[in-house]
């Protein structure tokens, strides 16, 4: 389960932000995953991961689709990473002087980000409870990919 934001860079006359400029704007650590889902720090690719070095969780995926900026957050994740995701969206929107973006293909306003933080925190809790119910006493395990290492839940 994930949530995806699409930020449209509309202005014809303004210079468009590129991935490296977005990374610098966020102030976050970054890297890419190799074919074994290991993080290669300080690398930029078509899909780049943003994360907080002091509170690593699952990371925010950043990529471009033509001039659109896309950010994806995998759930479940930590409350601090959910907040960081919406703070990152707000930073980008404020830099572009826009108030609206697409959240899972629905147009929303950055002023509603606090509401979405709450939604995603509740969705994360729900997903963890669902995993717990599915694993129960059975010999079953779920893998959730973290920014540095996979996290195994279950037996």
Show where each model-derived region lies:
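Acidic (Asp/Glu-rich) sequence patches and key acidic residues
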Residues: 1-155
């Amino acid at each position: 389960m994930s949530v995806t934001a699409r930020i449209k860079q509309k202005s014809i006359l303004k210079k468009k932000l590129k991935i490296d400029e977005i990374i610098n704007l966020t102030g976050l650590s970054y890297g890419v995953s190799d074919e074994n889902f290991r993080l290669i720090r300080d690398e930029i690719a078509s899909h780049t991961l943003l994360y907080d070095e002091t509170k690593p969780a699952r990371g925010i995926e950043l990529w471009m689709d033509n001039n659109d900026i896309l950010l994806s957050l995998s759930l479940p994740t930590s409350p601090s990473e959910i907040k960081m995701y919406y703070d990152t969206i707000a930073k980008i929107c404020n830099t572009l002087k826009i108030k609206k973006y697409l959240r899972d293909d629905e147009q929303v306003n950055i002023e509603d980000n606090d509401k979405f933080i709450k939604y995603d925190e509740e969705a994360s809790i729900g997903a963890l409870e669902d995993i717990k119910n599915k694993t129960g006493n059975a010999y079953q395990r779920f893998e959730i990919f973290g920014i540095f290492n996979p996290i195994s839940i279950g037996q």
